[in-house]
Amino acid sequence: MIVVTGGAGFIGSNIVKALNQIGYNDVLVVDNLKDGTKYANLVDLNISDYMDKEDFIASIVAGDDFGDIDAVFHEGACSSTTEWDGKYMMDNNYQYSKELLHYCMERTIPFLYASSAATYGGRTEHFIEDRQYEQPLNVYGYSKFLFDQYVRALLPQAESQICGFRYFNVYGPREGHKGGMASVAFHLNNQINAGENPKLFAGSEGFKRDFIYVGDVAAVNLWFWQNNVSGIFNCGTGRAESFQAVSDAVLDYHKKGQLEYIPFPEKLKGRYQAYTQADLTQLRAAGYTQPFKTVAEGVAEYLRWLNHNY
């Protein structure tokens, strides 16, 4: 059996899909379906069981036996960069992750988990997996950073795989439940379908992010598991592309609409990553050689899926 926490969420459900595609259907999905709309991410997937997050944590803390577990993909977390309830964030993203990590280490179960490019904060260069480059801008980024630090301290004595992935700007199928936290491509597509012009924040032509297609993220997770590689790795394309490039890809797909700019929100000033670009040196050195989709390629594939499924 494989456990995928956050398995009904965006990246988690795409990992379940990738597992299904290699013939692996014995998957325990752990999630919180208080937002009932997330069920839609699981409808076309094969899983063997579902468990509520709170029940799962209680079982982990109690040391319950789940039988043979081949791996845990820990994608479950609060991923809102605008959530400022620090206690909630640390309980959800840090304490929970520690409990699960120790459970896996004690049983030599491979543990692969979601970190984030938010650990790098507001820098504009050197997105490198090293302490000197890490300075998160919000409590979400801090919760991920602190767990990475915790993992670093344990890695030298770990007898089983521990692998963290610093996800950059992920977009693609199964993110619709994320609302305001869904990708720019998702929102621009919705605006055009509603008969509106697509809108970006003023200055967006100067904002560049490392946008990575979720199918590529799932592929990275599976490769590292199958190759038993430990460490903390950036998971991006290594290319910074502008929000303008995303809107160009959306407009190109729809063949209609004209880009509009709206004022940049006051509440995001100073707390917004204007530039991200993954340094892939360590990822490539670990042996991962697959190419990553460009924004033009990934957005086109995503919009074909999105406009067929919604």
From Swiss-Prot:
Active site: 140 (proton acceptor), 178 (proton acceptor)
EC number: 5.1.3.20
Cofactor(s) it depends on: NADP(+)
CDD domains to which the protein is assigned, alphabetical: ADP_GME_SDR_e
Pathway: Nucleotide-sugar biosynthesis; ADP-L-glycero-beta-D-manno-heptose biosynthesis; ADP-L-glycero-beta-D-manno-heptose from D-glycero-beta-D-manno-heptose 7-phosphate: step 4/4
This protein's record includes keyword Isomerase: yes
Cofactor binding summary note: Binds 1 NADP(+) per subunit.
Catalytic activity: ADP-D-glycero-beta-D-manno-heptose = ADP-L-glycero-beta-D-manno-heptose
Record-linked Pfam families: Epimerase
UniProt-listed Gene3D superfamilies: NAD(P)-binding Rossmann-like Domain, UDP-galactose 4-epimerase, domain 1
Enzyme class: isomerase
Binding residue positions for substrate: 169, 180, 187, 201-204, 209, 272
GO biological process: ADP-L-glycero-beta-D-manno-heptose biosynthetic process; carbohydrate metabolic process
Alphabetically ordered keywords of this record: Carbohydrate metabolism, Isomerase, NADP
Residues reported in the UniProt entry to bind NADP(+): 10-11, 31-32, 38, 53, 75-79, 92, 144, 170, 178
GO molecular function: ADP-glyceromanno-heptose 6-epimerase activity; NADP binding
Family note: Belongs to the NAD(P)-dependent epimerase/dehydratase family. HldD subfamily.
Assembly: Homopentamer.
NCBIfam families given in the database record: heptose_epim, PRK11150.1
Biological function: Catalyzes the interconversion between ADP-D-glycero-beta-D-manno-heptose and ADP-L-glycero-beta-D-manno-heptose via an epimerization at carbon 6 of the heptose.
Domain topic, free-text comment: Contains a large N-terminal NADP-binding domain, and a smaller C-terminal substrate-binding domain.
Record protein name field: ADP-L-glycero-D-manno-heptose-6-epimerase
